[in-house]
Amino acid sequence: MRGLAIFVAGTVFGLAVTALAQSQSPNHGIVGVNHVGINVPDLDKAVEYYTKTMGFPEAFRLTNASGQVQLVYVQVSKDTFVELQPATAQRPPGITHFGVHVDNMATATAMFKQRGAAVGDTTVSGTKAILSNIVDPNGIRMELAELPPASLHRQAMERWR
């Protein structure tokens, strides 16, 4: 019984310390890097490579009104994805951005604006994620993503094995 009491007390203490540390974090509300976006010359080949060769299951895909695939997400881990989009003349092949999962978009954008970042408008994507973008001085785009329960990302995370 004494061992159980010590275990419970230690667990409660650990949770309290973790909560305190997170509340004092300079990046409070940032969950972590969520995805990397890549424009690819052949979407079917890229999906085949990432699913068959790399073993990353397809999480979801988004099509436009005419049925053309706009993007495919493959899932690396429960909360990490690779976003694949067809390359075009306007979107050449290569890595286009990285995505950062945030708990609350309003809080995250306010924090980054206060720090001097030029934060783009907040939108809701076709995947039902709430998005905003920041471009760093080197031209690298960071996509902030809040993932509500209705978002395809959150649904894929919940289905993860």
Please place each PLM-identified region on the residue numbering:
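Vicinal oxygen chelate
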Residues: 2-7, 12-29, 62, 73, ...
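Core segments of cupin and vicinal oxygen chelate
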Residues: 28-31, 37-81, 114, 122, ...
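Eukaryotic phosphotyrosine signaling hubs
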Residues: 33-35, 95-97
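Short hydrophobic/aromatic beta-strand micro-patches
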Residues: 39, 99-101
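Short amphipathic alpha-helices within nucleic acid-binding modules
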Residues: 48, 105-111
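Solvent-exposed coil/turn segments that connect beta secondary-structure elements
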Residues: 79, 103-105, 147
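Short, charged/polar, Gly/Pro-enriched secondary-structure boundary elements
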Residues: 79-83, 139-142
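Amphipathic N-proximal alpha-helical interface segments
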Residues: 84-88
